[in-house]
Design a protein with these regions (language model features):
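Short beta-strand His + acidic residue motifs that chelate non-heme Fe in jelly-roll/DSBH
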Residues: 151-154, 171-172, 222, 228-238
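Double-stranded beta-helix
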Residues: 166-221, 226-227
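Conserved short histidine dyad/triad with adjacent acidic residue
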Residues: 141-155, 174-178
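A gly/proline- and charged-residue-enriched helix-loop-helix capping module
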Residues: 107-142
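N-terminal auxiliary "cap/dimerization" subdomain that precedes the catalytic jelly-roll/cupin core
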Residues: 1-101, 306-321
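Non-heme Fe(II)/2-oxoglutarate
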Residues: 18-20, 232-321
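A short beta-loop-beta micro-motif enriched in histidine and acidic residues
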Residues: 137, 150-160, 207-208
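Catalytic micro-motifs at enzyme active sites that drive phosphoryl/nucleotidyl and oxygen chemistry
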Residues: 21-23, 89-92, 128-132, 147-153
Length: 321
């Protein structure tokens, strides 16, 4: 497998691991595209290793579960307890049962997986930074499920290399610039207020998506705020091979940070002054002015939030505490 030759990675087995972008003659950080990789062979990404990872993440509330019966149109809400109260050991013992679903969030909090994320990004770093310098805050999310299962429609702040490790899944992705799918106001609300309440799937959106039917060794790259969702159908599953495992490798850059700051300032213009400001990227000269102002707005919001939290009354400690 060809990789970014400036930074190859080698696992304990001697195998060289990486994401192969050479299948894309014109890879761009601003465009959705398919890709190939071989991280499905990495020892840390096999199901027994992931069960051990889940045991380590569970006390940190980094194992997430969805309620039964969700659809792609459901709100993307999740909890740190299984809806039936199952332990992590039981979750993995029964992971091939239809509609089983667990996500391992922020795997980078475990040092060996933080190192793995660095290896994955090193295999593409020079290609990414040709367009978007200063990669930072690399995070990882692993989704483990048995069909029929879905991940609801949503957007993320980060750019995303999405890698299929085991089983099959269909990933549907829309352009982040398609305002008929997610309005600029909804994107701003997500960036500023962390809310997905106005990011909801409608069946009329489906024809406008790019669909990727992926198996082990396949993947998809999509830019920040690209609407996306997944589904896994039962037709590929057989006893002993009925689990889908996907790895979202997320990262920020100077470009995503700049866009977020423009969204922050646009929110002030829209809500406070009733303006209809240009979205990030539509007016680069204005973005140059908005971004530092948005940085100030964001810092002020965080400070105000911290002050409000500290001012909330707390229960008095018991006598003698």
């Amino acid at each position: 497998m060809k990789m970014d030759q400036t930074s190859p990675t080698t696992g304990r087995t001697g195998t060289s691991f990486g994401i192969d972008l050479d299948t894309q003659d014109r890879f761009s950080t601003s465009k959705i595209c398919s890709l190939k990789h071989n991280f499905h062979q990495h020892p840390l990404l096999q199901l027994p290793a992931l069960e051990q990872l889940a045991r380590e993440l569970d006390p940190l509330h980094k194992c997430r579960f969805v309620r039964p019966g969700i659809t792609q149109a459901s709100g993307f809400s999740h909890a740190d307890r299984h809806p039936e109260g199952r332990s992590i050991e039981e979750v993995f013992r029964r992971i091939e049962e239809p509609a089983s679903w667990v996500a391992l969030y922020n795997v980078e909090v475990i040092p060996r997986y933080r190192a793995l994320l660095g290896e994955i990004m090193d295999s593409v770093r020079s290609r990414v930074e040709q367009e978007q310098p200063d990669i930072f805050l690399e995070t990882g999310f692993i989704f483990i499920s048995a069909p029929p299962s879905v991940t609801p429609f949503h957007i993320d702040r980060e750019n995303n290399f999405w890698l299929q490790l085991q089983g099959r899944k269909t990933m549907s992705v829309w352009s982040p610039a398609d305002r008929s799918v997610v309005s600029v106001e909804a994107v701003e609300e997500f960036i500023v207020a962390h809310s997905l309440r106005n990011v909801r799937f409608k069946e009329a959106f489906r024809p406008g998506s790019q669909e990727f039917d992926v198996g082990p060794g396949d993947g998809v790259y999509f830019p920040s705020t690209s609407p996306h969702m997944t589904r896994s159908e039962p037709n590929w599953a057989i006893p002993g091979d009925g689990v889908s495992v996907s790895f979202g490798v997320n990262f920020y850059t100077s470009a995503t940070r700049r866009a977020a700051r423009v969204h922050q300032f646009n929110r002030v213009l829209r809500k406070g002054l009733n303006f209809s400001p240009a979205a990030p990227g539509q007016a680069p000269v204005l973005d140059t002015l908005k971004a530092p102002l948005g940085h100030v707005v964001g810092a002020a919001r965080r400070l105000a939030g911290a002050v409000l939290r500290s001012a909330r009354p707390t229960a008095a400690p018991p006598p003698g505490a």
